[in-house]
Curated annotation (Swiss-Prot):
Higher taxonomy: Bacteria, Pseudomonadati, Pseudomonadota, Gammaproteobacteria, Enterobacterales
PABS domain ranges (all copies): 9-238
Sequence positions that bind S-methyl-5'-thioadenosine: Q33, E108, D140, G141, P165
Family label: Belongs to the spermidine/spermine synthase family.
Record keywords: Cytoplasm, Polyamine biosynthesis, Spermidine biosynthesis, Transferase
GO molecular function: spermidine synthase activity
Subcellular location field: Cytoplasm
Protein name: Polyamine aminopropyltransferase
A Pfam family the protein falls into: Spermine_synth
SUPFAM superfamilies reported in the protein's UniProt record: S-adenosyl-L-methionine-dependent methyltransferases (SSF53335)
Function: Catalyzes the irreversible transfer of a propylamine group from the amino donor S-adenosylmethioninamine (decarboxy-AdoMet) to putrescine (1,4-diaminobutane) to yield spermidine.
Length: 288
């Protein structure tokens, strides 16, 4: 039997992961980017950009459930949600499951990303693009948060790593804009990489966010294809009580929501804010 082609991730120089490629569904390599979607027997459809896995059908639910349900249930009565990025539609899918949310705005810099993902990753959006509460805005995320007249209860930054096009979503200009259009007691969250390998990302985000929010921290989860340990999510708000809600309060909100999740549950919610000592020490050692 012929040996299967392998795709190797290039995120780190000294080690990494590979996937057997059963079938290439799409591959575009230009001077600006290298985008591929292929099928793998273990992880389903895999999308990678510039040599780095962005999402897989098998484990995306962990990332998207934790990015949405943690801030939305901590807030408790979010009506207006902003998603920056998220063109694959999975973040939108999870937000639409909250029936008390009245409007969902998604800002994507490239309209082609949405149509592309609708075609090649239909399980990610699961029809959520057709939700009547959803509005798509084609714009740069930094520009939008600094110019919009809308305000939001929860802002979710579904950004790539802080290199290339995703770098602007880790800047002070972006964080300042998010603070500008966030309602009182609103919550901002963003992915911040695998902290064991990308600790400087967390430190940098913590330092910048602390200029604009009184309560800044992280919560975490483990996602198989984002290897190297736990992935951290930045958390920023001016209501410090929201990060310390009891499991009983979250449980009551969870039951009232009617959510049925594959990863998230109220115990996971409260436990996610417990961080490893090496990250706590790194954050504490930074000048204020």
């Amino acid at each position: 039997m012929a040996e299967k082609k392998q795709w190797h991730e290039t995120l780190h120089d000294q080690f990494g992961q590979y996937f057997a490629v059963d079938n290439v569904l799409y591959h575009e390599k230009t001077d600006h980017q290298d985008l591929i979607i292929f099928e793998n027997a273990a992880f389903g459809r895999v999308m990678a950009l510039d040599g780095v896995v962005q999402t897989t059908e098998r484990d995306e639910f962990i990332y998207h459930e934790m990015m949405t349900h943690v801030p939305l249930l901590a807030h408790g009565h979010a009506k207006h949600v902003l998603i920056i990025g998220g063109g694959d539609g999975a973040m939108l899918r999870e937000v639409t499951r909250h029936k008390n949310v009245e409007s969902i705005t998604m800002v994507e810099i490239d309209a082609g990303v949405v149509s592309f993902c609708r075609q090649y990753l239909p399980n990610h959006n699961a029809g959520s693009y057709d939700d009547p509460r959803f509005k798509l805005v084609i714009d740069d995320g930094v520009n939008f948060v600094n110019q919009t007249s809308q305000t939001f209860d929860v802002i979710i930054s579904d950004c790539t790593d802080p290199i290339g096009p995703g770098e602007s979503l880790f800047t002070s200009a972006f964080y300042e804009g998010c603070k500008r259009c966030l309602n009182p007691s609103g919550i901002f969250v963003a992915q911040n990489g695998v902290c064991f390998l990308q600790q400087e990302e967390a430190i940098d985000s913590h330092r910048k966010l602390s200029h604009y929010f009184s309560d800044v921290g992280f919560y975490q989860t483990a996602i198989p294809t984002y290897y190297g340990g736990i992935m951290t999510f930045a958390w920023a708000t001016d209501n410090d009580a929201l990060r310390h809600l009891s499991t009983e309060i979250i449980q009551a909100r969870f039951l009232a929501s009617g959510l049925k999740c594959r990863y998230y549950n109220p115990a996971i919610h409260t436990a996610a804010f417990a961080l490893p000592q090496y990250l706590q020490d790194a954050l504490a050692s930074q000048p204020s």
